[in-house]
Design a protein with these regions (language model features):
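N-terminal, polar/charged subdomain of small-to-medium soluble alpha/beta proteins
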Residues: 1-90, 101-109, 113-138
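Short hydrophobic/aromatic beta-strand micro-patches
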Residues: 95-97
Length: 138
């Protein structure tokens, strides 16, 4: 299994397929999360992400290995951005490649949900009149 784990200032959305391509893979699944313009009926102006980078990378590697073992993946990619991000900007990219599509679909969902639960990356939402640190959840 080959993994590509990074904390980055900007997400390169073009890297997913090129990295995940593998001669034994019949399926590739990629999830890209971006900043949406509202949360709970409030307009979002921007988000700010910060990470405990060394711990985040270790936990992302553990998650990638768990997924690989459970779904027999050829490759896993997990990139998360830090810093200030505006509406529509990508903030996270996760993906998996496997022999069959069902495995990579399930693995990709596990990767993003588990990243949000376990990885020490924090998000602050900026609204018109307030700022709020968000509690992690899948």
């Amino acid at each position: 299994m080959d993994i590509n784990i990074k904390i980055v200032s900007e997400i390169d959305t073009t890297i997913g397929y090129h990295y995940l391509a593998h001669e034994e893979s019949g399926g590739h699944s990629i999830f890209i999360g971006s900043v949406r313009n509202s949360t709970q009926n409030e307009t979002v102006h921007e988000l700010f992400f910060e990470a405990y980078e060394s711990m985040a990378l270790l936990e992302m590697e553990k998650i990638a290995k768990e997924a690989s073992q459970k779904w027999n993946l050829q490759k896993v990619i997990m990139h998360h951005a830090v810093g200030t991000k505006k509406v529509k900007e990508p903030v996270v990219l996760v993906g998996a490649s496997s022999a069959h599509r069902e495995a990579c679909f399930e693995a990709c969902r596990f990767l993003i949900d588990t990243l949000k639960e376990r990885v020490p990356i924090w998000k602050k939402e900026f609204f018109e009149n307030k700022k709020v640190w968000v509690t992690p959840h899948p």
